[in-house]
Amino acid sequence: MQAHVSIILPVHNAEPWLDECLRSVLQQDFEGTMELSVFNDASKDKSGAIIEKWRVKLEDSGVHVIIGGHDSPSPRGVGYAKNQAVAQSSGSYLCFLDSDDVMMPQRVRLQHEAAVQHPSSIIGCRVRRDPPNSTERYTRWINQLTPEQLLTQVFTSNGPTVIMPTWFCSRAWFSHVGPFNEGGQGVPEDLLFFYEHLRKGGGVIRVDQSLLLYRHHPQAATHCVLETTIWTHRVRFLEEQALPRWAAFTIWNAGKQGRRLYRSLTAGSQRKVVAFCDVDENKIRKGFYCHEDSQERPKPRIPILHFRAARPPFVICVKLDLTGGAFEDNLRSLHLQEGQDFLHFS
């Protein structure tokens, strides 16, 4: 019988966390039919035995369990494991779960309600971080974005505005967007899927309750992706989705990050940069930034202005929540509309 919701669980050497993760599947208060689709990606620890132990408990409580996997010498990667778990499942809705995280009992029920209302959206939720003081700024960002910012802040270094371990969507929409990139270690498969979702007009919704205990530890797959890889994808997505709307723009930050963005742009996008802006008097006194690596003659010289003298739209390369509120106050004082007059790329 086809389940209503499939919980998609890729597993690789998850022994320390798997009991707690699978117990949270058993404790869901969703009243529809639910199945668990596990794909064991070449685990070499006791993950397989733990899955078998919980299969009995889950099936006794009415949750059908499908187990796939392989025991090759090395794993095929998170994207592959997720795709396999989706392919072997049957539910009309997909609830993604990482093997080191723990769902709150109401997660499936509340996200399913939202997904029924928003069939072409990715549904996320708020999270509780474990340990509580790890990645405080990032956790605040995940939990406090406004509904509008879920779509306007998709260019930042934080990645998807609802994090992958909280994703819930219809199978039909997943099939329309997916599958995940299977490049393996070092590929930001969640970010690439999220960008493709946005390209296809998908929405982003967050259930404003903390429905997941989101673990931070050194073995997490997130730590395997290079910052330079993510940077390249982000710049290309900015150029594809945002910059075509603007004939000219200002880069807010004449320091390292702003100059790095400028140098990363294509020549066509570089020509749209009319100025850098900043609050640092030393940078402003310099008067301009000269792009020494440019093939153009004369080399481009971009003015550096005080932010009050600069004209929107802005691409902002200043990190949020780091200056004790000074940057945020400056931005607010200009009375601009996010998404229209400025975008964050920090």
Swiss-Prot record:
Biological process, per Gene Ontology: regulation of translation; tRNA modification
Keyword entries, A-Z: Cytoplasm, Glycosyltransferase, Transferase
EC number: 2.4.1.-
Enzyme class: transferase
A Pfam family of this chain: Glycos_transf_2
Gene Ontology terms, MF aspect: tRNA-queuosine(34) galactosyltransferase activity
Reactions listed under catalytic activity: queuosine(34) in tRNA(Tyr) + UDP-alpha-D-galactose = O-5''-beta-D-galactosylqueuosine(34) in tRNA(Tyr) + UDP + H(+)
Subcellular compartments: Cytoplasm
Tissue-level expression: Widely expressed. Highly expressed in adult pancreas. Expressed at moderate level in kidney, spleen, thymus, prostate, testis and ovary. Weakly expressed in small intestine, colon, peripheral blood leukocyte and liver.
An annotated GO cellular component: cytoplasm
Primary location group: cytoplasm
Family statement drawn from the similarity comment of this UniProt entry: Belongs to the glycosyltransferase 2 family.
Role noted for this protein: Glycosyltransferase that specifically catalyzes galactosylation of cytoplasmic tRNA(Tyr) modified with queuosine at position 34 (queuosine(34)). Galactosylates the cyclopentene hydroxyl group of queuosine(34) in tRNA(Tyr) to form galactosyl-queuosine(34). Mannosylation of queuosine(34) in tRNA(Tyr) is required to slow-down elongation at cognate codons UAC and suppress stop codon readthrough, thereby regulating protein translation.
PANTHER family per record: GLYCOSYLTRANSFERASE, UDP-GLCNAC:BETAGAL BETA-1,3-N-ACETYLGLUCOSAMINYLTRANSFERASE-LIKE PROTEIN 1
Stated name of the protein: Queuosine-tRNA galactosyltransferase
Record organism: Homo sapiens (Human)
Gene that this polypeptide is encoded by: B3GNTL1
